[in-house]
Swiss-Prot record:
This is Acetyl-coenzyme A carboxylase carboxyl transferase subunit beta, chloroplastic. Keywords: ATP-binding, Chloroplast, Fatty acid biosynthesis, Fatty acid metabolism, Lipid biosynthesis, Lipid metabolism, Metal-binding, Nucleotide-binding, Plastid, Transferase, Zinc, Zinc-finger. GO terms for biological process: fatty acid biosynthetic process; malonyl-CoA biosynthetic process. Its EC number is 2.1.3.15. GO terms for molecular function: acetyl-CoA carboxylase activity; ATP binding; carboxyl- or carbamoyltransferase activity; zinc ion binding.
Length: 508
């Protein structure tokens, strides 16, 4: 936690506006730091209070204020302090009404002095009472009273100024240390000119400084919404600032979210292809102003009335619709790709993992039938975890239905179909239309499989080799034709379509 010197806080305008002083707030001289002392009782009886204005007679306050728990603070309290000249003053705190007053109320001070500092002169002169138990009681009383004053002052300053600095101080430890070192050097140079006043505040300075350091360490260990531990990884930072940054799944580097879309969701550090939403992919591939969606209002009716103990299926659908702005896990429609009219379907992994249910299967089937009727080239961007278990065998039937429509499109009409496999493409999508293309394209580092790694290992009790389900490894085995990064993808598709006699509409 950042350390604050008392004079620097008094110079802050926000502190001046929050506190109402009985004396005018003039300039304060430098606040000296002191070395460690062995006699806290003797030092505390000689605290110095500096004047608030040029005509006041208060002496210097040499306190190094730290940070403590505000729960230990009393909202309305009056304290007694005594300067090196023997003059007594009362300090009044009222945190509820924002009052901080210093008064020279001699009757009140005399009464408190008789109660708490009765034997202070005897202690300073080295004399002892005839009753040892009474001496120990007075020592304990004075020690407790001084600690109470320090605690309340610390807590008040924490409440007024430092309460909003948790995150900043947690992230700027190095700058805080430098600032603390500079303050210490300035205070030490000032102490050389005021060495006769240092001994009266050794205990308070060292005590509160220690408390501040302990508080700082505890805050670094505590995990909360406002405090970031020193040992936190990029993952923890990303969770807290995910509205600003996107973390790479490969190198764990942070990418500024504002520019992430313009970078095609590619990591700036390692070039890794991160997941894209269906809307971003449509914007990437389709010419502006040419997108015409199809079957947008088609939604699932829960065909097998699937119910879960955690959350009903219909409620989950409604939740994903609110979060993604989509009605289902695929968007279908027509548009132009570099002037070439195409039919395109784009799956969205953010909607229930891109799982294929009855609506997804029906929308893709209708898209294929439309492309067959209009003699259009077909693109389907795959991003799915497979068939949707909440719809049982109905979801499995979509594999056969889509494959049947593709057979008519490719074999009977001799039209051109290009699937684009992105990460992840698994399950029923891989086993059906994902691998039925005339030219199969995959993105770099895409995870492509029928059964996932965890399922295979649990079923066969064997370890799946690392990278055996990555696009580069599968390409060497001949599972698809091209691995194309996102940057040239649109140009590659345009060349393929023209090679298969699909030309732009405006071309003569």
């Amino acid at each position: 936690m950042k350390r604050w010197w008392f004079n620097s806080m008094l110079f802050k305008k926000e502190f001046e506006h929050r506190c109402r002083l009985s004396k005018s707030m003039g300039s304060l001289g430098p606040i000296e730091n002191a070395s460690e002392s062995k006699d806290p009782n003797r030092n505390d009886t000689d605290k110095n209070i500096q004047g608030w204005g040029g005509h006041d007679n208060y002496s210097n306050v040499d306190l190094f204020f730290g940070v403590k728990d505000i729960r230990n603070f009393f909202s309305d309290d009056t304290f007694l302090v005594k300067d090196s000249n023997g003059d007594s003053y009362s300090i009044y705190f009222d945190i509820e009404n924002h009052i901080f007053e210093i008064a020279n109320d001699h009757p009140f001070c005399s009464e408190l002095e008789s109660s708490f500092y009765r034997n202070s002169s005897d202690l300073n002169n080295g004399s002892k009472s005839k009753n040892p138990d009474h001496d120990r009681y007075m020592d304990d009383t004075q020690y407790t009273w001084n600690n109470h004053i320090n605690s309340c002052i610390d807590s008040y300053l924490q409440y007024q100024i430092c309460i909003d600095n948790y995150i900043v101080s947690g992230n700027d430890n190095s700058s805080n240390n430098n600032s603390s070192n500079e303050n210490s050097s300035n205070e030490n140079s000032s102490n050389e000119n005021s060495s006769n006043e240092n001994s009266s505040n050794d205990y308070i300075s060292s005590s509160i400084s220690s408390q501040s350091e302990n508080s700082s360490q505890n805050e670094d260990i505590t995990t909360s919404d406002q405090t970031i531990p020193e040992s936190s990884t990029h993952m923890g930072v990303t969770q807290q600032y995910r509205h600003l940054w996107v973390q790479c799944e490969n190198c764990y580097g942070l990418n500024y979210k504002k520019f992430f879309k313009s970078k095609m969701h590619l990591c700036e550090q390692c070039g890794y292809h991160l997941k894209m939403s269906s809307s971003d992919r449509i914007e990437l591939l389709i010419d502006p102003g040419t997108w015409e969606p199809m079957d947008e209002d088609m939604v699932s009716l829960d065909p097998i009335e699937f119910h879960s103990e955690e959350e009903p299926y219909k409620n989950r659908i409604d939740s994903y619709q609110r979060n993604t702005g989509l009605t289902e896990a695929v968007q279908t429609g027509r548009g132009q790709l570099n002037g070439i009219t195409v039919a395109i379907g784009v799956m969205d992994f953010q909607f229930m993992g891109g799982s294929m249910g009855s609506v997804v299967g029906e929308k893709i089937t209708r898209l294929i039938e439309y492309a067959t009727k209009e003699f259009l080239p077909l693109i389907i961007v795959c991003a799915s975890g497979g068939a949707r278990m909440q719809e049982g065998s109905v979801s499995l039937m979509q594999m056969a239905k889509i494959s049947s429509a593709l057979y008519d499109y490719q074999s009977n009409k001799k039209l051109f179909y290009v699937p684009i496999l992105t990460s992840p493409t698994t399950g029923g999508v891989t086993a059906s239309f994902g691998m039925l293309g005339d030219i199969i394209i995959a993105e770099p580092n895409a995870y492509i499989a029928f059964a996932g790694k965890r399922v295979i290992e649990q079923t066969l009790n064997k370890t799946v080799p690392e990278g055996s389900q990555a696009a580069e490894y599968l390409f060497q085995k001949g599972l698809f034709d091209l691995i194309v990064p996102r940057n040239p993808l649109k140009s590659v598709l345009s060349e393929l379509f023209q090679l298969h006699t699909f030309f732009p509409l405006n071309q003569n």
